[in-house]
Amino acid sequence: NLIGAEQLFLSLEGFHQHGFFDLKVRIDGDLQVDGHHSVEDCGIVLGQAIREAAGDKKGMKRFGQCILPMDATLVLCAVDMGGRPWLNFDAAFTAERVGYLDTELVHEFFYAVSYSAGMNLHIKVLDGQNNHHIIEAMFKAFARALDEATGMDGRITDVLSTKGTLG
């Protein structure tokens, strides 16, 4: 039953397409209660998948960023795959819900992703009033920043760290 998960699926489809990530999502949760646990669990699982796919991070660019325009919306996203989890999330939604998705759960999703992946993640809405476009732009900007951060660079022979190690 997708009731309550449509906006999340649409957002993850944007993440998949704009980050060039191979992603299939199936959510079995307690959506009849509310979407909190399902959205949070989806973020945890995605974060774990990102951590696993990143492997030892040798040759990885580590940092990625994107400023993404979508109609009247402008979103900044920056990623550091250095192993230290952190989320800086700056968004002021003007509605409590988009479809059946509580807008406060967008923060919960990205918090779960950043901590499960061990990434430093900054998402800032620079402009925008349409909550649907803001959420969609966040996921697409995150995808593009993560694609850049996890990209390989032949000039990087080990991990990109002055300490010689990444968490």
Show the residue positions of the predicted features:
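Structural preference for solvent-exposed beta-strand-turn elements
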Residues: 1-167
